Amino acid sequence: VPRGGAAIDRVGVAVQTGVAASTARLMLHAPLTNGLPGALLFDWGTVSTATGGDKEITISATLPAGLVLLTCVVSAAVTLYGFESYGTGIFGNSSQAGSEGSPYRDNGSMTAPNPWGTTGISYSADRTARLAVRAA
């Protein structure tokens, strides 16, 4: 996020395969020194992930300047579209030739974790979930 922050009016997630009656909670976390999510900055609420497609929430927020992490918690085993992480070390690869994607962990509930926590961290096979914000 640029110096001075950035005003946004939408936050969303791209769902590939939904699960009936499921939802995703969309949030923003500050990073820990190791790059994993830390303190909760925003909890924007939930969107339905019962069907595929781009799901968004209309919001009014100003993101703080610097590195921040868009995060989500899903209520079921939905399939999210993602960015392939091969050759993009910033998204969790151990090297430019690595094949690990973004970090995740079983939250055990739909609550907004604050802080995110570092126990039980796993890494997706090869992709980073496609979460997005829109400038106001």
Region locations from a protein language model:
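Short, proline-centered helix/strand-breaking motifs
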Residues: V1-G5
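A short beta-strand element within beta-rich, extracytoplasmic domains
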Residues: A6-T17, L70
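Short amphipathic alpha-helical surface micro-motifs
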Residues: A7-R10, G52-D54, T111-W116
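Aromatic- and Gly/Pro-enriched, solvent-exposed loop/edge beta-strand patches characteristic
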Residues: A20-S99
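Short, surface-exposed beta-strand/loop patches at domain edges
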Residues: V73-A136
